Amino acid sequence: MALVGAYAHAQAIIETLKGAGLVVGDGEAPRPAGRSEIITPCVVVHMIDGGMVDGTLADPDEWVDARFQITAVGRVAAEARDIADKASAALAGGVTVAGRRVMRVQPIDPWGRVERDNDVTPPVYYSTQLWRLFSFPEAP
């Protein structure tokens, strides 16, 4: 019996988004080497608090209900919405976690509002969406 780690789940989400042709940041916006501006458009993945683990008497922590946030970033509001829609479509197509079966990837808050971030140069627009991913061990 062991808790299921977040690494494999986070990597599966990131790889799914990259597989859809999106530029993806892991916990922070991607930036060109040695430069400060954000690569746009892009998506940033954050594993967040919440969710739960459950299971059987034999392995009480084998089922995972993980929560994560997708932040879509664009140069204009419409681009942020477009990237958010592309990320949603990629996730709806399914996520593969090594050694696990993913029952569902579900939006919790599918239409995040778009906001302008003036704290970066040049300013960008971003939209956040909350998601959950439910997985359990593959059958032997």
Show the residue positions of the predicted features.
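Short, solvent-exposed beta-strand/turn "edge" segments of beta-rich domains on protein surfaces
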Residues: 57-61, 119-122
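Acidic-leaning, charged glycine-interspersed low-complexity segments
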Residues: 89-140
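Residue-level signal for beta-strand positions within conserved beta-sheet cores that form or flank
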Residues: 41, 66, 101
